[in-house]
Amino acid sequence: MSRAEPARTRTFSWDDPLASAAKGVTMDGLDYLRLVASGELPPPPIASLLGMTIDELEHGHAVFGLEPAEWMYNPIGSVHGGIAATILDSCMGCAIHTTLPQGHAFTTTDLQVRYLGAMSHDTGKVQAIGEVVHVGGRVAAAEGRIVDGDGTLLAHGTTGCLVTRPPRADAQRHRQVV
């Protein structure tokens, strides 16, 4: 059985993510994310791929927007759960990032998502709201939720993140000597 050519296509473009990341380490997390949100720095490729937007930023708080689309569907005809996980991971991680000083970064260590309602292209714009629960010297935690335009809760998530610090000057000297 031969398969017909697809009737739908999707293309996207992105900027060099390392150039933006290099600028990010020169400022605190909130200032960096504000430049991304304003368009002064390009968004990361995942945001371009999914069409995610940064709708709100405050210290310890990040809201991302997303328009569910047909190309995001799973085999049963609704938006794939990985899309919800991705936008939750993004808003919760960025909520943590808004609290970090210059040169600090984070990486997700765990992510838990509870799916409470389906998304489709008929859902309309959804927002993922991330809130910091704890930020320490090495670990951070946040929670997030995805709501539709009526405020209906579609998913809830929690995350743990490792906070990374810039290398110490004496550690860099040691690396250069060795």
Predicted regions and their residues:
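Terminal targeting signals and extreme-terminal segments of soluble enzymes
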Residues: 1-178
